[in-house]
């Protein structure tokens, strides 16, 4: 990690910032500050904000339970996409999880989120299941959720 990069552990004091960043990434489906507060008060949920030159560029929130973790939400600000931050954030999460003896990671992603699917596959995730018609789109259509896992 360069001197310009910094990891900040998420706390309840970051709920507004997380909600703002989430809304820029998930228009129409964003979580609000209350949602993040409810997540962050649970002991099994953790997260960090990835900053570059003191500017928050993305964050990831996950849940840890008995040697496994699940990504609950993850985003990179649209202004900072395609610059390698997504890969850096997941790599930092893997480093952390390895240190705390988590050996399996799970996530779910919309089957039409091709960029995210490509990233996750490149980071070692494989599809293990699907949830049929799980995500509802604004036009009324549905898409499957792809459940993926990776060994840490």
Report residues per predicted region:
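Short glycine/proline-centered loop/turn elements that form peptide/ligand docking sites
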Residues: 86, 90, 113-116, 133-139
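Short hydrophobic clusters on alpha-helical segments that form packing/core surfaces
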Residues: 93-97, 105, 116
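Conserved catalytic-core motifs of GNAT/GCN5-like acyltransferases
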Residues: 106-108, 121, 126-141
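Acetyl-CoA-dependent GNAT
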Residues: 2, 9-83, 90-92, 96, ...
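Structural preference for beta-strand elements that scaffold enzyme active sites
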Residues: 68, 104-106, 147
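Terminal substrate-recognition subdomain of acyl/acetyltransferases
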Residues: 140-152
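Short amphipathic helical patch at the helix-1/turn junction of helix-turn-helix
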Residues: 76, 110-111
């Amino acid at each position: 990690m360069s001197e310009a990069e910094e990891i900040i552990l998420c706390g309840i004091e970051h709920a507004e910032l997380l909600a703002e960043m989430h809304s820029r990434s998930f228009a129409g489906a964003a979580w609000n500050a209350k949602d993040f507060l409810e997540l962050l008060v649970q002991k099994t949920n953790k997260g960090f904000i990835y900053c570059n030159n003191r500017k928050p560029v993305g964050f990831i929130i996950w849940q840890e339970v008995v040697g496994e973790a699940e990504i609950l939400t993850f985003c990179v600000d649209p202004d900072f996409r395609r610059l390698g931050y997504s890969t850096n954030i997941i790599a930092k999460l893997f480093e952390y999880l390895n240190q705390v003896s988590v050996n399996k990671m799970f996530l779910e992603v919309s089957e039409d989120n091709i960029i995210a699917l490509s990233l996750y596959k490149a980071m070692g995730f494989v599809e293990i299941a699907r949830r049929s018609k799980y995500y509802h789109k604004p036009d009324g259509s549905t898409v499957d959720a792809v459940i993926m896992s990776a060994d840490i």
